[in-house]
C-alpha cells in the first residue's frame, strides 16, 4: 500500500470526511453534500479508484472524479430516496446500480437515465422496513 493514500469516511448525520494523507488530517466535505447529511454507501469505480459514488439519505447520488476532493450530484429519479447501496459493473462502468427502499435502479449510461428494477421486495414487512443494503456485480 502506498505511503499516502486517500480515505473517505461516510457518516450517519455528519456527512463525509476525506483524508489525503493516510488519515493524519481530515477535511469535512461541505459542498454540494451537506455536512449534516447521512452517507449510506460509498463505491469506487473498478477501472479508476479516483472516481467515487456516494449514496445519501434522501439526496440521491453524488460523484467525484478526483479522489473525493470535488463532488457533483447525479441527476436521477432517486434524488429523494435513501440510497443504501451502490455497485458499478466492472465490465462496463457506465452501468451503475443503486439500491433504495425496497427497490433498485440501474443506469446504463453513466447515470444520465435510470430504470427501476423489480427485485421482489415489498414495502409491507412484518418487522422493520425492507432495504436493498448491498449490491455486487459480477
What are these regions (language model features)?
Residues 1-138:
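Extracellular glycan-interacting surfaces
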